[in-house]
Amino acid sequence: MVKYPTGSVMPLRAAQRQGKKALLKKASFSDRGMTLEQQINESNQYYLDAGIAVVHKKPTPIQIVKVDYPKRSRAVIREAYFRQASTTDYNGVYQGYYLDFEAKETRNKTSFPLKNFHEHQILHLEQCLDQEGICFALIGFMTLERYFVTPASFLIQAWQNWKAAGKSSMTLAEIEANSFEIKSGFCPALPYLEAVDRIIADRKQEHGNK
């Protein structure tokens, strides 16, 4: 029997059947084709459930415009707008390392437009790198079904080249040469921590395995 916090119970067989249904539902959802954000969120949940890492999507800030108070103890938001996020999409902790990254997708097949990033995001990644954080962009070429973990150091350099010389995109070849490609799967949907392991290994090698 499975006992819930409310005190209700469910026979173990029924609970197992329910778990199988949830698994099948998740599998069919994956087959339909998820957005990059959905794949990352599902991966983060897998990492959390498995005790591997704690990574969450940062909430989008909201500007509240109008609030009604039908009761003195209760407020009802009548009008609100999403504001532009001030930093990046995701952050968390993995094996004692702080992770901070932005997720971007494109339908392009040969390049990724740098205009998809905002200047404040690049600045934030740069600041986190200065504090020894593991920072990157998770880029999805959705038409090609290819995914890359691009270290922030290369992204920052590409951004600076755009501002200085007008080169407004990263070619697929450049991303291939300066990123870690990951393959989509089932559990997790996007195993981006495999690339993070390689970033950590490279950093240790640069610092003499300290």
From Swiss-Prot:
- Gene Ontology terms for molecular function: endonuclease activity; magnesium ion binding; nucleic acid binding
GO CC annotation terms, alphabetical: cytoplasm
Q: Which Gene3D superfamilies match?
A: 3.40.1350.10
Which Pfam families does this chain map to? Answer: RecU (PF03838)
Obligatory cofactor(s) = Mg(2+)
Where in the sequence is the signal peptide annotated? none
- UniProt record, GO biological process: chromosome segregation; DNA recombination; DNA repair
Residues binding Mg(2+) are: T87, D89, E102, Q121
**Catalytic class of the enzyme:** hydrolase
Free-text function comment from the UniProt entry? Endonuclease that resolves Holliday junction intermediates in genetic recombination. Cleaves mobile four-strand junctions by introducing symmetrical nicks in paired strands. Promotes annealing of linear ssDNA with homologous dsDNA. Required for DNA repair, homologous recombination and chromosome segregation.
UniProt family annotation? Belongs to the RecU family.
- The molecule here is called Holliday junction resolvase RecU
Tell me the name of the encoding gene: recU
